[in-house]
Amino acid sequence: MLKEILSSALLMLIMIDPSDKILLVSLLREDFHIEDVKSLIIRANLIGFILLLLFAVAGKIILQDIFHIELDALRVAGGFVLFKIGLEALEGGGMVTIKREKNILALAAVPVATPLIAGPAAITAAITLTAEHGIIVSIVGTLIAIAITAALMMIALYLMRGISKTALSVTIRIIGLFIMAIGAQMMITGAGGIVLNLIKGA
């Protein structure tokens, strides 16, 4: 079982992809106090784990049988959210617009916990791992991947402390461009999947 757990954790870590979470932490560092961002990281990863746990247990029923939602539709919606955040950062707004509208807990839920942590790829992995290896392997593997993601986000947060305001401002805009690209790719992938399904169904 150990081999299955480790391979499941690796797959889930790849699907979660900590790199874009690290980029977002860099954005948050400009607009929020470091203690608030630390709190956000913990809450976001906890919420992300709960969501993935839910989908690992009953993902197929929730998505397809109850709400009739395809994963490609989630990709498009999640990509739009990320694209909007990246655009604000690129224009120099950072997370200010979101900060005015939502408290730190709400921001931890959206967009950090979902779609960044519990995104379409991670949700698909949770459902697949449960089907292939059972619920225990899926849950433990997901927990390990979430713990690694949270640790990397914390490390990135402290590394950003030594960067000057000017360098941080330039970095924020570059990061914003990458986040826009991630969001655009999610939308393209999702839209492509929707079109392909429509063609197959025709």
Swiss-Prot record:
Record-annotated membrane-spanning stretches: 5-25, 47-67, 76-96, 104-124, 135-155, 174-194
Compartments in which it is found: Cell membrane
Membrane-protein topology: Multi-pass membrane protein
Entry annotated with the keyword Flavoprotein: no
Keyword terms, alphabetized: Cell membrane, Membrane, Transmembrane, Transmembrane helix
UniProt xrefs under InterPro entries: Multi_antbiot-R_MarC (IPR002771)
GO CC, alphabetical: plasma membrane
Top-level lineage group: Archaea
Family: Belongs to the UPF0056 (MarC) family.
PANTHER family per record: UPF0056 MEMBRANE PROTEIN YHCE
Identification of the protein by name: UPF0056 membrane protein PH0214
Native source organism of the sequence: Pyrococcus horikoshii (strain ATCC 700860 / DSM 12428 / JCM 9974 / NBRC 100139 / OT-3)
